Amino acid sequence: MTDIVDLDRYPLDKLESAEGQALIKDCQKALSRDGMFNLPGLIRPRMLEQMVGEVLPIIKSSSFTHRRRHNVYFLPEIEGLEPEHPALTEFETANHTVCADQIPDSALIKLYLWPPLADFLAAVMQKPALYPMDDPLACLNVMAYRS
């Protein structure tokens, strides 16, 4: 996995180490404060390019496209807002989805199925365990938003 993940910077495979525990605590703090955490450089640049190269042609040629019109709330009305309120203005979005079965041998699937990633995420979210989904389509989706 060292070819995909920068394990020197992010010791996901050594969560019991002092460095692993510090990473977990830092991510928990960011998650609590910001609702998210960011791990810049987690995926090595060369592998990130490879992952994009594996997925992009499929997005362009055979992704599932879903278009719909909606407002920012995805609801026709919001209590307390007049119908002409700007937040209720509708716009169209289109997302293009590639499912896991379309990229079965990709580096992205390899990363998703790597047990230390699930262990790390479980530790950050203070869950006893997380598991990869068995569904061969829904376990991993890559989405692109464009016209």
Q: Where are these predicted regions, by residue range?
A:
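Long, hydrophobic, well-ordered secondary-structure blocks that form the structural core
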Residues: 136-142
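Short, solvent-exposed beta-strand-terminating loops
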Residues: 57-79
